[in-house]
Amino acid sequence: MTTSSDRTPDPNEFGGKRVLVTGGTKGAGKAIAERFQRGGATVIITARSAPEEKNDNHFIQADVSTPEGTSKVINEILNRFHGVDIIIHNVGGSSAPSGGFITVTDEIWQQNINENLFPAVRLDRGLLPSMI
């Protein structure tokens, strides 16, 4: 039986598509970016630090948990690529202490919202008009 992981990706599956992958230099984000690239997409990755290995993806160094970082990403994408077709919001994480929600302070909640929710909100708001 052939599974989807056994098949070689169609190199034109995402041909002509511009794909943004946040947090695209390591782990799941890196794998997602590589898969879109194998499918023929123009891939744009963001992260706070440059990728350790050279690749063919366009890299934008930015901290998307900040308004300045998301503005940098939006402006560069609109100026260079005139928008995107697909956005993968991969960036995120948690710095919550152990002990459950009762131990989480308002400051930790705000930090997690800034790191996990606002990047998607800001990027969607800035890039969605180019996707319609």
Place the predicted regions along the sequence by residue.
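A glycine-rich helix->loop->beta "capping" turn
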Residues: E76-H89
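A short, exposed helix-loop element centered on a Lys and neighboring polar residues
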Residues: D124-R125
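The beta1-alpha1 cofactor-binding region of Rossmann-like NAD(H)/NADP(H)-dependent oxidoreductases
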Residues: A62-K72, D106
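Conserved glycine-rich cofactor-binding loop
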Residues: R18, T25-K26
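Conserved glycine-rich Rossmann-like NAD(P)H-binding loop of the short-chain dehydrogenase/reductase
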Residues: G39-E53
